[in-house]
Every structure is written in structure tokens, then in C-alpha cells.
Regions:
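Active-site-adjacent loop/helix micro-motif of nuclease/hydrolase catalytic cores
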Residues: 99-110, 136
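Substrate-engagement module of ASCE P-loop NTPases
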Residues: 114-118
């Protein structure tokens, strides 16, 4: 009995960074084995710094901008990316919160989402929350999380079988959305051949 109590205490000591790495490992196990394309592979990584902007120094007489060589970047908790040869395409960013999430978190992460997607319009951006016992997304996230493409709650540190299945399905659908957005934005100045665009809302 004492041994079991010690194990439970050890599980309870997991922090946000450790939990995010656990989820990243789960994703990589799936992506490496089940999600491959003929010329590309998919991977997940943590603490990746992505650009959100750069500084315009001045303009020439034709108003062509001269940019700073250094990009402004934000660290992101988890990134799922596609690797094509020597090129990397960020597909999905997932910010992480563990055991609690506040209004400030929703606003701050939402602002990051907007800035990153301004530079990478095909990027999907979401929030995952771990070890939330009631597993309900709180109202403050609906009120202040409008810039997220998705949000997902895990009841405990270790995903249940159903959570694992649902989360993987969510990530795969977001990768597909990113691919579709890339195709859509690639039709600029051409006939798109697209006759319908729908933005869906799903609640589980």
C-alpha cells in the first residue's frame, strides 16, 4: 500500500514541461508509424521558437522595405511539422497548460496565435490542458479563446484510451486543414477551382 502511494505521489509531481514532452512522445510514436506521405514525414517537437515578425528599418525611394536581418520569435510549447527533403513546414502549434488555465493564458496564447498565423497563414494553432479532473473546457476559454483553432482537455497526466484516440484524430484533422489552407493560399492570382469553403465547429 505504501509503495502504491509513493507511485501516485511521483506521478503528481509531473510539471508542465514534463507533461508536454510526454504528449510529444505520444504524437511522435503515432506520426512516425502511421502518418507518412510519399515525399515527406511528420514529426513533433517541444520548445520551438517560431517567428512572429520582423522590423522594417527604412524604405527606398520606390517604397520597397529594408528589413532587419533578425527575426522576432516566440517559443511555442509543441509544434507538429512536415519535413520535405531539407525543408520544414510547421503545420500545427499546440500551447500547453497543466492543471489550471486562466483568462490571462487564453488572451496571451491567443495573441501569439494571431501573430504567428499572420506570417504562416496555413498554420493551425490550439491549446491543450492536462490533469483537469472535471475535463470541462472553462467558459473563460470560450470567451477569450476565439483565436484558437481547437482546444483539448485531458482529465489526468496519462491520457485515457479514448482521449488518446480523440486527440490523435484531432491532430490529424488539423494537419489536413493546414494542407488545405496551403493549397488555398497557393491559388493567389490564379483560378482557384474552389467553389465551397466551410469553417466547421465541433463540440465533444
Amino acid at each position: 500500500m505504501a509503495k502504491e502511494k509513493k507511485t501516485n505521489m511521483a506521478e503528481g509531481k509531473m510539471n508542465e514541461t514534463e507533461w508536454t514532452k510526454k504528449i510529444c512522445k505520444i504524437l511522435n510514436n503515432h506520426l512516425n508509424n502511421h502518418l507518412k506521405k510519399s515525399k515527406s514525414t511528420f514529426h513533433a517537437d517541444t520548445n520551438v521558437k517560431l517567428p512572429y515578425g520582423t522590423v522594417i528599418k527604412d524604405f527606398d525611394k520606390n517604397w520597397n522595405a529594408s528589413y532587419s536581418e533578425k527575426e522576432n520569435k516566440f517559443a511555442t510549447d509543441l509544434v507538429i511539422y512536415e519535413e520535405k527533403g531539407d525543408r520544414i513546414i510547421p503545420r500545427v502549434v499546440i500551447e500547453a497548460k497543466f492543471k489550471n488555465v486562466g483568462t490571462h493564458d487564453a488572451i496571451t496564447y491567443g495573441k501569439k496565435a494571431v501573430l504567428h498565423k499572420n506570417l504562416m497563414p496555413a498554420l493551425r494553432y490550439g491549446l491543450m490542458i492536462g490533469s483537469m479532473e472535471d475535463r470541462d473546457l472553462q467558459w473563460r476559454l470560450f470567451e477569450h479563446g476565439g483565436d484558437f483553432d481547437f482546444m483539448f482537455c485531458f482529465k489526468a497526466e496519462e491520457p485515457t484510451e479514448d482521449e488518446h484516440k480523440d486527440f490523435i484524430a484531432l491532430v490529424e484533422s488539423e494537419i489536413e486543414c493546414s494542407n488545405n489552407l496551403e493549397k488555398m493560399f497557393g491559388t493567389k492570382n490564379t483560378k482557384s477551382g474552389i467553389y465551397c469553403l466551410q469553417k466547421d465547429v465541433k463540440l465533444h
